[in-house]
Amino acid sequence: MKKIIYRIIMVLLIGIMLISSYFIYKSRKEDKIQENIYEEIIEVAKAKENKEENEEQQEINMQELYNVNNDIVGWLKIDNTNINYPVMQTKNTQNYYLRRNFYKEYSQWGTPFLSENCDIQSSDNLIIYGHHINNSKMFGELEHYKKEEYYKNHKYIKFYTMNEKKEYEIIAVFKTVAYTGFKYYQYSNFNNEREFETFINKCRELSFYHIEKNINYGEKLITLSTCEYSQENGRLVVIAKGIL
């Protein structure tokens, strides 16, 4: 009887190991596919050489990307990190790119996307969402911003649109709880200076460390948001102000 029980347990354990191995393999295969897709998109994004334009203008060819998928509204880049991705927006379909890649195919990684409540041209605060993927992929890189030393070496965020290149400087990094915590995602526009200051003060209050940067009402913001796993429904948020 004991031998039978032992064999049953061994069969179950082997079965669990095989199933686990399959899912690990499947996950790694999916990661590799998505890495290849984004490497391909980066090649499309590389601007064609034009001697009449300066190097900064050549950095990202938004028109080429738009020709492939006209849902693109920008390109997000943080130097010396893995964050170098297109940013999509579908105002009529909420979270469309949550589980879709740049080519609108199913993807666990999804694609960074601009909140449907934002207007790429006029919003005071551009709120961009992205998945927290292991190995610092997608917005998983933001996890490093919990440490002040990392922030000091990666202060600036570049954001390209169809018409211009913008640069932002980080002013706060914090975590909160979705739905019951600080509702930062409701602030795509500010009705008045008091509302703006309330938002900024709350961001700084929650920030992992103090960043001594002046910011004035009317200055544009960008917000990067991803999941944060130290708490249920956690969110990790990076706020930056426009400097160029």
Where are these regions (language model features)?
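N-terminal Sec-pathway targeting helices
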Residues: 1-13
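Solvent-exposed, non-transmembrane regions of membrane-associated and secreted proteins
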Residues: 17-244
